[in-house]
């Protein structure tokens, strides 16, 4: 079909619908006019756009913060566009220096491979993986010869690299910057050249890297991609970006009760943002909810319960969501112990340090984590709070151990 042919009224309506839906939650589109032009071209020709999301496979656990861009990809996919999920197995050996204050450790090939597989499995909870192209950038980056690398490096100046806030801070404070770190945005940009990307999606912290794709596509004679950025969502502390290392996250692979319980601790002022960015709840419903919260006709607790139910339903199904909601009401609103506390057969010493007990029961992943939880008042034995890290527990039959608000264990000596 002629790409210059005017759109029919039906096609124009579809373009308007796509642009409006795909702009939901977006912070910036560069350039905005090209975004609409690409959608128009796709509708006119019937050819789907190539939509790219690059992943640095250094931390494989997907949390709600990651799903902001994944929900956007899902929208593109529902409109028939082609999703290119790029696993940076080659760039992952460097690690994305964005926001880092020091040089990152290099991952082994095996670590990158394992992390990438975990990513794909978890992303499949949001995307239709059968309709998603999975690419590894080692396919083309490992084929570059040294003269190709020199050509690539010649597209960027050191001064331009130092405009990046993270590099600038490290340079000014005397922190080392390895030359290979400068290649990360160059390689990410070259990925867009190799993949012939039409639109690249990423968080606002990826703006520099995404713009690099446009610059390199032009340098290599390709049509320039559109950059589309989405917000970084604050974690459960309400201040810092959601991150597993900061322990302010909701992991999509966590148990349903854990997801629901964590959702109930989302700060009131962030609820609407979570709804808009991390769910597919229609905007008119979100606007009505926002209005209700503002005029007091909707209680924040009820809005959080709906959000928690939605998160669990998205990643574990409706039945699990219903059960998690009931569990929360029983344990936290009625202050009762759950009926289905896991039972552990205890065959160890009858006198055991509390820290060792928590780790042995897999209620904490390390002694350091257990120590911090005890000091923070998050551990109870038979509903009695324990804050002394040196406590030695006398193990009894049917003794209840509680960590935080949602982890329980019952010990059996028989």
Curated annotation (Swiss-Prot):
It is an enzyme of class 6 (ligase). Disulfide bonds: none annotated. Its EC number is 6.1.1.1. One of its GO terms (cellular component) is cytosol. Its main location: cytoplasm. SUPFAM superfamilies: Alpha-L RNA-binding motif, Nucleotidylyl transferase. One of its GO terms (biological process) is tyrosyl-tRNA aminoacylation. Keywords: Aminoacyl-tRNA synthetase, ATP-binding, Cytoplasm, Ligase, Nucleotide-binding, Protein biosynthesis, RNA-binding. It is found in: Cytoplasm. It catalyses: tRNA(Tyr) + L-tyrosine + ATP = L-tyrosyl-tRNA(Tyr) + AMP + diphosphate + H(+). One of its GO terms (molecular function) is RNA binding. ATP binds at residue 244. A motif ('KMSKS' region) lies at residues 241-245. Residues 352-413 form the S4 RNA-binding domain. A motif ('HIGH' region) lies at residues 57-66. Homodimer. Catalyzes the attachment of tyrosine to tRNA(Tyr) in a two-step reaction: tyrosine is first activated by ATP to form Tyr-AMP and then transferred to the acceptor end of tRNA(Tyr). NCBIfam families: tyrS. Belongs to the class-I aminoacyl-tRNA synthetase family. TyrS type 2 subfamily. This is Tyrosine--tRNA ligase. It comes from Shouchella clausii (strain KSM-K16) (Alkalihalobacillus clausii). The gene is tyrS.
């Amino acid at each position: 079909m002629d790409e210059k042919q005017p759109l029919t009224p039906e096609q124009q309506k579809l373009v308007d619908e796509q642009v409006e839906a795909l702009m939901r939650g977006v912070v910036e589109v560069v350039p905005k006019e090209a975004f609409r032009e690409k959608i128009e071209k796709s509708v006119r020709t019937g050819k789907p756009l190539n939509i790219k999301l690059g992943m640095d496979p250094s931390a494989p656990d997907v949390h709600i913060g990651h799903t902001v861009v994944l929900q956007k990809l899902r929208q593109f996919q529902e409109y028939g566009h082609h999703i290119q999920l790029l696993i940076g197995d080659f760039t992952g050996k460097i690690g994305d220096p964005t926001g880092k204050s020091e040089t990152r450790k290099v991952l082994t090939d095996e670590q990158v491979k394992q992390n990438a597989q975990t990513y794909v499995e978890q992303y499949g909870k949001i995307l239709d993986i059968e309709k998603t192209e999975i690419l590894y950038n080692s396919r083309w980056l490992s084929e570059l010869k040294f003269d190709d690398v020199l050509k690539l490096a010649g597209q960027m100046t050191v001064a331009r690299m130092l405009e990046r806030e993270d590099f600038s801070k490290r340079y000014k404070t005397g922190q080392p910057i390895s030359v290979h770190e400068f290649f990360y945005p160059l390689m990410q940009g070259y990925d867009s050249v190799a993949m012939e990307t039409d639109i690249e999606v990423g968080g606002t912290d990826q703006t520099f890297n995404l713009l690099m794709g446009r610059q390199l596509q032009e340098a290599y004679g390709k049509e320039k991609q559109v950059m589309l950025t989405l917000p970084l969502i604050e974690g459960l502390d309400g201040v810092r970006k959601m991150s597993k290392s900061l322990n302010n996250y909701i992991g999509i692979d966590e148990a349903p009760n854990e997801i629901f319980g964590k959702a109930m601790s989302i700060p009131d002022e962030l609820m609407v943002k979570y709804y808009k960015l991390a769910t597919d709840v229609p905007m008119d419903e979100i606007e009505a909810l926002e209005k209700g919260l503002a005029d007091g006709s909707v209680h924040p607790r009820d809005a959080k319960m709906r959000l928690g139910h939605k998160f669990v339903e998205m990643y574990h199904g409706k039945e699990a969501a219903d059960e998690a909601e009931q569990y929360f009401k029983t344990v936290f609103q009625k202050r009762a112990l759950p009926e289905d506390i896991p039972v552990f057969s205890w065959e160890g010493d009858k006198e055991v340090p509390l820290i060792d007990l928590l780790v042995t029961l897999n209620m904490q992943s390390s002694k350091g984590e257990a120590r911090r939880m005890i000091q923070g008042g998050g551990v109870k034995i038979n509903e009695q709070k324990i804050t002394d890290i040196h406590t030695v527990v006398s193990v009894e039959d049917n003794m209840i151990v509680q960590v935080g608000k949602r982890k329980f264990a019952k010990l059996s000596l028989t």
